[in-house]
Amino acid sequence: MVVLKLLMPESSSQNFNHLKMHSQYSICEGAVKIDDLQDFSKSNKIKSLALCDTSNLCGALEFAEKISKVGTQPIIGTQINFKYGDNVGLLPLFALNEEGYKRIIKLSSNSFLENDELSDPHVDFNELLDDNIGVAIFSGTVFGLFGELFNKGKFSE
């Protein structure tokens, strides 16, 4: 529980949504167990919370079921590596509805299935541009795809 106290405000009235929560399903990025998120959300009356594990949706069902039981609105997301030209970087994606959820499942799966076993999981950025109905796409960080393009002076591409 100590980790959660560092990530969330002390106030019991939530004025923001934490959109980049990583669980134990984000290898080397998160250690928070979904049961702990459930307990924390209940005790702090968190209105909504997003799970955004990297390259997978393995915890999405468990998260949605457990968080919903305590009155917190689950927001399902993931961050996936996208390739644009010779640049690769993460973009956080969030499901706005069931169609968006199915879309990010497909993108997450494709990131593993459509690459050779020697490359890191990624999806061509054009695949996201071609079909993103029901998906909220965030810019990520300076280490994300858009940050990489900006840092290399290629953002206008």
Which stretches of residues belong to each language-model region?
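Phosphodiester-processing cores and adjacent nucleic acid-binding clamps
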Residues: 1-157
